[in-house]
Amino acid sequence: MKTFEVMIQTDSEGYLDAKFGGNAPRGFLNPNGLPTYSPKISWQKVEGAQSYALELIDHDAQKVCGMSFVHWVVGNIPHNVLEENASMMDKRIIQGVNSLTQGFIRSSLNESEKQRSNLNNSVYIGPMPPNGDHHYLIQVYALDIPKLALKAPFFLGDLHDKMHNHIIAIGRKEFLYKQFVRK
């Protein structure tokens, strides 16, 4: 499989700026106090790619919640960049459900409440590691089709199902985020 470089701005030690996670100043948090202001992520253009897809995962979260935490799932990216705050501003992309959604396991939510939770959580949710600094993995997929047949809300597994046999190259990048300190 062909690979390509993914870029995200970090400090000299590989840490993402605080404004993109739970340690952000209040102005970068949503009205519920959650970090939904996404960083700029770019990558090398891939010859033959008609679109791209992206996932941002925290595998260190397994120590906290027993599973990897999905921070961002994005499909139908037309170019090789997601600008800063694309999660809130870029209407060309389709975003999947992050791990803050409710109702997966033994839930008191009915189906319509689950659907609402899934739609509300189809955005970037920034890092908030509670037990120390965490490593985060961005994977970008170059695809040979212009659009994936995705409909909101969709999950990471749905993205992978639709990308099957359409991935022509993959790019990866890791970064760190400092432990979340509640203010």
Placement of each model-derived feature along the sequence:
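N-terminus-centered regions that define maturation/targeting leaders and the start
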Residues: 1-183
